[in-house]
Amino acid sequence: MTTAFRATLAAGALAWLAAAPLPAQSGAGPASYPPQTRFPGENAAAVARHLSAARRLAGSDLLPEFYWRCLTSPLDKATVFQIQHNGLVEPTRVFDQLYSVGQNAVSAWALDTRDGIILIDALNSADEARDIIVPNLKKVGLDPARLRYVIVTHGHGDHYGGAKYLQDTYGARVVASAPDWAMMERPGRGPFAGLVPPRRDVVVKDGDQVTLGGTSVRLYVTPGHTPGALSLIFPVTDKGVAHVAGLMGGTGGGQDSASVHQQVASLRRWQALTTAAKVDVPITNHPTHMAANEKLALIRYARPGDANPFLYGQAAYRRFVGVQEQCSRVQLARMGETGDD
């Protein structure tokens, strides 16, 4: 490392610290520090029981997934906002026909077929579709004019925000369940106030398929996170070797007791569906749910012979779904319930 390079690096680090001081260096007192979320009515014994079950299922290889879903996400919102921020991520070919083309906070996946592209989720807005998805498709060698379908996994703005732009610009068909079409068509709130949804197009039912260019994506309605969250099973290959990917459309938990109970039931059903389909690849619609951005970096810097980090294997995928279920049961226990059936 040259002296000039060290000087440049040091100057950059000092500039970063000056622009964004760490909380401990900001001069603010402890009274201003954000607390972890508290659950005063929780059933502590049930929380402990389901946390223990989730941790056992996680083993050592799925600890990041366990930590995020069971602990970090519900307990430490400040960390969630720091990690799950809007940011640019290098688009990456993950499987022979599957590409990550989203951003740091939320995923978008392009499934390439001989007759066009199926896009899974459309980020937050028309701006992100135009300035992130479209350039990312081009960077990995895909022509956005070949977009044929946009599958919206659930009716939150960060997943359908760019769908209308892609519908209007490229004529892509937009796919969602009936409950989540209705959800998208209601006026948005908070950061999604004023967001214009896509025109209602393809309404799918549980068990339907979207087929394009010989590739079929099976769709299942898995309520919980939203009333009509869609979960997907589809084939991929890694250097020509066949695998099966599974994307649970709403792993972020429910909003109240009833929706979390729905989530638990959906995850149990998803376990059966993905076991029967021999799913061995997890795909998520937020990178944080499986440390996906870290895995993308491993792929970009892979050496010959390195394993694809998205290949979990069937047994590990079953444990992954089991962790999600137990973490939903933890959520119920934090509401004061047992978390049991």
Walk through the language-model features, giving the residues of each.
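Bacterial N-terminal signal peptides
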Residues: 8-20
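Signal peptide processing junction and immediate N-terminal pro/mature segment
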Residues: 20-26
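Accessory terminal helices/loops
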Residues: 26-81, 239-242, 250, 254-341
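Active-site HxH/HxHxD metal-binding segment of metal-dependent hydrolases
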Residues: 33-40, 49, 56, 127-131, ...
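Conserved beta-strand hairpin/beta-sheet module of binuclear metal-dependent hydrolase folds
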Residues: 84-140, 231-252
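Metallo-beta-lactamase
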Residues: 87-88, 93-95, 131, 142, ...
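Active-site neighborhood of phospho(di)ester-bond hydrolases with catalytic His/Asp-centered motifs
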Residues: 120-121, 146-155, 175-177, 221-224, ...
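Active-site environment of divalent metal-dependent phosphoester hydrolases
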Residues: 127, 155-161, 181-184, 227-230, ...
